[in-house]
Amino acid sequence: MSASLNYKSFSKEQQTMDNLEKQLICPICLEMFTKPVVILPCQHNLCRKCASDIFQASNPYLPTRGGTTMASGGRFRCPSCRHEVVLDRHGVYGLQRNLLVENIIDIYKQESTRPEKKSDQPMCEEHEEERINIYCLNCEVPTCSLCKVFGAHKDCQVAPLTHVFQRQKSELSDGIAILVGSNDRVQGVISQLEDTCKTIEECCRKQKQELCEKFDYLYGILEERKNEMTQVITRTQEEKLEHVRALIKKYSDHLENVSKLVESGIQFMDEPEMAVFLQNAKTLLKKISEASKAFQMEKIEHGYENMNHFTVNLNREEKIIREIDFYREDEDEEEEEGGEGEKEGEGEVGGEAVEVEEVENVQTEFPGEDENPEKASELSQVELQAAPGALPVSSPEPPPALPPAADAPVTQGEVVPTGSEQTTESETPVPAAAETADPLFYPSWYKGQTRKATTNPPCTPGSEGLGQIGPPGSEDSNVRKAEVAAAAASERAAVSGKETSAPAATSQIGFEAPPLQGQAAAPASGSGADSEPARHIFSFSWLNSLNE
């Protein structure tokens, strides 16, 4: 306990000496005052040498000798409080010396030069002659050996002072290291928090700027809309004012003319001569009659001056504006996910519908439809004849049967001729125009005539010219195919005659117009299982015989 008290007293004395030294520092040279020390009128102290230097710096034009100002009088400012010090004819030597400060400086120098007392070994408080050499573990205080043998610590456990010293010193060192590490971590956290504060300020500033820009944009829209609506009201105002002012001008002119007539009539009433009066009265009466009959007062409608139809109701907009608030990103993400799911479902259904439409369009398209206008017209006729139910028929007899192509695919490289060069000609009676379909297909001179109609064998997509180019012996197979196709065509014609309610578009699907005479058909896209499905082809080569 005495050692701790001695240490505390020593530390207090050292602190007192340090504070005293701070008070004895000159504000000019920043060292301890040197004699003589002068006191200024403001009660601050300076070294006389420092006071002379500052006085000379404040009065550089005064003559000096040996670094001392010779002229009498002058002034300078206190370096501590900036108070102006006025000197008499003695200059800085006229300032009073501060003997108290000089004595304190002497005492301080004596104390500071005195050798330090060596710290003695601490002694026990109960046994003043015994040194403290053991440490009581129960009471946790240092004590002496006599206290352990006879004193208050005889029943306590003790340990050598050096062991406890080393242990507590290591514990203190570890604690200091832990505190230093903790301080480093805390300092890092503080740095992160400071960065977070800066980031928050920057983000808030950015969001405020964006918010202000958006509201400024809304202000601009409102201002623009206000100007537009104001212009509408202004235009209506100008139109109505122009109309009313035109009426005012019209009525004013009429009033002026009538006033002139009235004035002329009053003057004419004073005419004493009856003959003169009668000569001019007729003209005046005619003018008065015309003025009274021709003028019609145009009244303004009731409420013409009101502008109630320009009233604006902003209750809904006000409600919307008051509901403006910040949105959360979580809600937007959920809405976007829901919208994407709906779009995917619609896309799947729509994709199937688009595929079906594309297949129908592919089946109903005719190749080379836009290449030649004449060919397009002939193809349109083919479409109309391919749908007998779409045209009015005068007689129940069906049109002449046209042999379609056989369903079996033709081998690649085999070419079947078209027109009058194909197969054996046979005389078939051509029905009259009245007995057939639309008379546009059969002219008037065609009635009752018989022409040689030819039966066209199927035209394969692989045909590239006229005439038989295939391998020998293909004629018999073509004739057999033509017979089979004719039988199938008659069955189809019978079925189509019964089903007259079918639309024309359905009869066009799956049919393709045959190539014109002298023009090669498009090559087949494939053969075997990869080739296109068989198409029913109508041939109208019997129309070519009409040119004969």
Curated annotation (Swiss-Prot):
Changing residue 241 to M: what effect? Rare variant; found in a patient with hypertrophic cardiomyopathy; uncertain significance
Q: Where in the cell is it found?
A: Nucleus; Cytoplasm
List the InterPro entries: COS_domain, E3_ligase_FN3/SPRY, Znf-RING_euk, Znf_B-box, Znf_RING, Znf_RING/FYVE/PHD, Znf_RING_CS
Under the GO molecular function aspect, what terms does this record hold?
identical protein binding; protein-macromolecule adaptor activity; ubiquitin protein ligase activity; zinc ion binding
Q: How is this protein named in the record? A: Tripartite motif-containing protein 55
- Give residue ranges of zinc fingers (B box-type): 103-145
Gene that codes for this? TRIM55
**Quick one: which residues bind Zn(2+)?**
124, 127, 147, 153
Phylogenetic lineage = Eukaryota, Metazoa, Chordata, Craniata, Vertebrata
Top-level taxonomic group: Eukaryota
Q: In its keyword annotation, does this UniProt entry include Cytoplasm?
A: yes
